[in-house]
Amino acid sequence: MDQLSMKKMAAQAALQYVKPDSIIGVGSGSTVNCFIEVLGTIKETIKGAVAASKASEELLLRQGIEVFSANDVSGLDIYVDGADEINPQKMMIKGGGAALTREKIVAALAKKFICIVDSSKQVDVLGSTFALPIEVIPMARSQVARKLVALGGSPEYRENVVTDNGNVILDVYNFKIMNPIEMEKELNNVAGVVTNGIFALRSADIVIVGTPEGTKIIE
């Protein structure tokens, strides 16, 4: 079974957690695009969605789903998003699509974070296969990069990418993240960092994995 089929399988399985008349938090990325597509099939049963990126907002509107601002809601039942890596503790690296800050904002509004992935995203240690994205205020880029080198990382500027918030991304290689919660806190305390792509303080509650054998749900 190919990767896209596994993503679609996980996205379809996430529909069982969508409650009637609710507003859904929606992340961004290729697996979430599959979820938005299937969410369109039940759009008459929900009030709408809060999107974590402009790209997801456009896809939701194209499906005929009303999009609300995060400022319009006091909370969400669920937030559905993918991950670039996820460990057995349901902690993640996210930000391959440069939407990490808004993803953290919308995830923080939700009672339940449902992570949908294909099996290739499962790792034992975060940072094993994917660089850690960090959103940085442009004027602090070099300063933050030096700090990341001092912490043992190898940062690379993601060229020609500007986030929805007008900032830049540094992708940090060679970080084996043994203590994700402490690393998330430490990196967020670096002056000039908006946020980093470790989702450990707010990890997933439910993980839906598309595998060649079928859908696996980890609660």
UniProtKB/Swiss-Prot annotation:
Homodimer. InterPro entries: NagB/RpiA_transferase-like (IPR037171), Ribose5P_isomerase_typA_subgr (IPR020672), Ribose5P_isomerase_type_A (IPR004788). Catalyzes the reversible conversion of ribose-5-phosphate to ribulose 5-phosphate. It is an enzyme of class 5 (isomerase). The gene is rpiA. Substrate binds at S28, G29, S30, T31, D81, G82, A83, D84, K94, G95, G96, G97, K121. Keywords: Isomerase. Belongs to the ribose 5-phosphate isomerase family. It comes from Histophilus somni (strain 129Pt) (Haemophilus somnus). GO terms for cellular component: cytosol. It holds the Pfam family Rib_5-P_isom_A. Pathway: Carbohydrate degradation; pentose phosphate pathway; D-ribose 5-phosphate from D-ribulose 5-phosphate (non-oxidative stage): step 1/1. This is Ribose-5-phosphate isomerase A. One of its GO terms (molecular function) is ribose-5-phosphate isomerase activity. Transmembrane segments: none annotated.
